[in-house]
Amino acid sequence: MDIIIRADAQEVGKEAAAIMAPFIKQGRTIGLATGSSPLTTYRELIRMYESGELTFKTIQAFLLDEYVGLARDDKNSYFRTIRDEFTAHVDFVDANVHSPDSTDPDPYHAAALYEQKIIDTGVAIQLLGVGVNGHIGFNEPTSALQGPTKVQALHPQTIKDNARFFNDCIENVPTHAMTQGLGTITRAENIIMVATGEAKADAIHRIVEGPLTALCPGSVLQLHADVTIVVDEAAASKLEHADYYRTMERIRL
């Protein structure tokens, strides 16, 4: 696990985009995440596209998750969010951006189909954010560390955190989502996690330096052979070995 500490969210985004760019240039499949932390990464990837450094015409992408019951064109769906924040600003083909079928009357069947599609295609590099309780995707605390794509009831903290996207009304937030499982996520060849802000500091500390536990789903990344975590100074503020991580980056061969 490589830990990279940058000054602020903009620098985090630049670093993450630089890590993802070689995979995109090679035409590899990428995994995309929603939330506030990846936004600066998407802005930098858009800049690289506009400058002619990248093209996404042949890239396949898989979304981490989707709310159960929200159509793709709903303003709060994650497919729509990713489109508005990223894919519509580059030359992505909409049909190449995959998400769970959130309107399937049998979400469990839809989750199984999505899992198989990811298995068949594979993901070269997965971009992740992290929740304040250590969740990745919608894998809430106590999620199976090797579980497949699933239907997940949302933790009250997650519902509270996401209410800001639903007119600050908790009652409007869906109670369930389909999410890639922790086993699905960690099948990606490479993983990059981004986190910014003091609110994420405890989760980053637990993921990097805490024990492997289902109570902190992100700690499963300790088992992956190729993980890079890019954080700003605020999100790194509770890391006990921050100076060591800075030194290791500086002397890396």
UniProtKB/Swiss-Prot annotation:
PROSITE patterns annotated for this entry? GLC_GALNAC_ISOMERASE
Database matches in HAMAP family: GlcN6P_deamin (MF_01241)
Q: Which catalytic residues are annotated?
A: 65 (proton acceptor), 133 (for ring-opening step), 135 (proton acceptor), 140 (for ring-opening step)
What general EC class does the enzyme of this chain belong to? hydrolase
Give its E.C. classification number: 3.5.99.6
Q: Which reaction does it catalyse?
A: alpha-D-glucosamine 6-phosphate + H2O = beta-D-fructose 6-phosphate + NH4(+)
Keyword Hydrolase attributed? yes
One GO MF term: glucosamine-6-phosphate deaminase activity
What family does this chain come from, according to its entry? Belongs to the glucosamine/galactosamine-6-phosphate isomerase family. NagB subfamily.
**Annotated InterPro entries:** Glc/Gal-6P_isomerase, Glucosamine6P_isomerase, Glucosamine6P_isomerase_CS, NagB/RpiA_transferase-like
Q: In which pathway does it act?
A: Amino-sugar metabolism; N-acetylneuraminate degradation; D-fructose 6-phosphate from N-acetylneuraminate: step 5/5
Instruction: State the protein's purpose.
Output: Catalyzes the reversible isomerization-deamination of glucosamine 6-phosphate (GlcN6P) to form fructose 6-phosphate (Fru6P) and ammonium ion.
Keywords for the protein's UniProt record, in alphabetical order = Carbohydrate metabolism, Hydrolase
Per the record, its GO cellular-component terms are:
cytoplasm
Q: What protein am I looking at?
A: Glucosamine-6-phosphate deaminase
**Which example biological process does GO assign this protein?**
carbohydrate metabolic process
Q: Organism source for this protein? A: Corynebacterium efficiens (strain DSM 44549 / YS-314 / AJ 12310 / JCM 11189 / NBRC 100395)
Record has Phosphoprotein as a keyword: no
